[in-house]
Amino acid sequence: MVPDADHLAVMRPKDRSHGDWSTNIAMQLAKKAGMRPAELGQTLAEALRKVDGIAQVDVAGPGFINIALDSASAAAVVDAVLKAGSSFGSNDHLSGRTLNLEFVSANPTGPIHIGGTRWAAVGDSMARVLEANGAKVVREYYFNDHGTQIDRFSRSLVAAAHGEPVPADGYKGSYIDEIASRVVKEAADEGQDILAMPRVRDEDGAEGDSPQREAFRTRAVPMMFAEIQQSMRDFRVNFDVWFHENSLYESGQVDRAIDELRAKGDIFEKDGATWFRSTTYGDDKDRVIIKSDGHAAYVAADIAYYLNKRRRAKDPCDEAIYMLGADHHGYIGRMMAICAAFGDTPGVNMQILIGQMVNVIKDGQAVRMSKRAGNVVTIDDLVDAVGVDAARYSLARTDYNQSVDIDLDLLASHTNDNPVYYVQYAHARSKNVDRNAAQAGIDRSGADLSLLDTAADNEVLGVLALYPNVVQTAGDQKAPHRVAHYLEQLAGVYHRWYNLERVVPMEPTGRVDLDQDEDRNPQPARAAARLRLNDAVQQVIANGLGLLGVQAPDRM
C-alpha cells in the first residue's frame, strides 16, 4: 500500500512554522484507503502523535502532514554526525556494483583544456559520491594514442623543430616548441641526430609517414602523457587505470571483437569497407569500422574497449559510464548499439553523460587564450589563476548539463559572493570556535542537546539532517553539484547561527545586565550543547568538501 519513493515525499517545509518535516503520504494513499486525503491525514496524524520524540502533528491543505519534533529528537542528528564522523552521510545502497567511470580522456596532443578540466572536477567528484554510496568505482582515462590526431601532433613537432610553418591541420602554441626542443635534446643526449633522419613530404607539403616523424612521435607522446598525468595528480585526480588505445590493436582485441559481431551476423561488407549493422540496435545509421583503405575507424576501438571494460580480469564493470564533451552527441546512438549488440542493456550496463561548455571570464570579458597552448585555456592556466580548491569547486557546483561561467575575479575574492570561500570560511570559522572554546575551558562532554531549542538552532539542525539524503540523491542521479548546493545552504544557516547564538561567553565587563545576558554569555550547559552543534556542522562541511575533492581549511 505504501507508494514508491518517486511519489512519496518527505521534505523540510519552506516555512519552518509548519514544522520540521512535511509529507504527502495521505494524498498518495487516499485512493487505496478509500478515504479523502484530509481524512486519512487526520488518521495518520493521530498515530504519529503517539510516537516518542514527536512534539506536534498537523494536517494542512489537501492532506499534507506537518511534523514538529521535540528539541531532543531534533538534536539527535548531532550525536549521529559525531558518532559517524567522516563516514556520516555514506551508505551502502550501491554496494556490490562496480562502475567504470571514464572521464577527461583528452587526446595526448596538448595540455588539458578547460572542457577537460571541468570533466576532471566533475568526474572525480562523481566518483567520490558514488563511492560514498557503496559502489566500487574504477576511475579510467582513455589515452587516444592511435590514429590521425597523433599523426597531426607529430607533424607539428617536426615542423617546429625545423622552424617551419605550422601544418594546415597542425597544433600550435609554445608547448609544441617546448616539446619539440625536448625531443631533439633527448635524442642528442642518446647520440641521435633526430633532425638528420629521413623526411617524407605528403601531398599537402607537410611531413608524411617518415622515419623522422615516427621518431618524434615515439619520444613526444610519452612526454605529453607524463605531463597530463602530472596535471591530473596536481588537480587531486588519481586514476586507477590509464588505458592506451593502441593496446586494443596490439593485443588483437579489436579483431576479436569484430569477429564476435560477425559471428552474430552484425558485420557486413560494402563499398570495400567493413560495416557494423548498428541500426539493428537503434542507431540512426550503420557504421563503418574498417575503411576501404584498410585503416580502422574510431568505432572499431570503441567496440573492443567496451568489451574490455565488461570482461577484463580485474574489476570488470557492471556499468560503463562515459563522460563526453558537448560535441559528442552523435556518439550516443552508436555506443548504445555496441552495448546492445553484446546482449547488454543500454542505460543499465552503459551510460553516456554529455557535458556542456565552460566560459572563463576575466575583467568581465571572455578569456580564450593561453600563454602556452595558444587558442585554448588549460587546466594549468585555471589553477594558476585561482588555485585547485576554487577551480574544482566552481566546476563541480554546476550541473554538467548546463554551461558554466568561471569568473576568475570572483573566485579570487574573499567575499560571500564567492561560493567556495563562503563554504570554506564556515569550516574555518567553526575551527576558530573550537579554539576559543578550548581557551575558555568549555567542556562539551555530556552536553544536553535538548538545550538546542532556539529558532537558529533548529534551522541548523534541520539542514544537518538533510545531508545523508543529499549524498544518496547525488549518487543516484550522478549529480555531484547537489553536494555543493547543500554545502552552500549549510554554510548559510551556520553563518546566521554564528551571528545569533554565542558559543563561547564574552569577556566579563563587570556589568550585571551584560554579564548575565544569556545571548551574550550562555550558561555552561547551553554553551556545551552549542559547541557540539558547531562540531557537527564542522564535520559535515568537511565530509561534503571531501566529496568534491576540496580542502576544509582550519584557518582563513
Residue ranges of predicted features:
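Non-catalytic interaction-recognition regions
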Residues: 1-75, 82, 86, 93-556
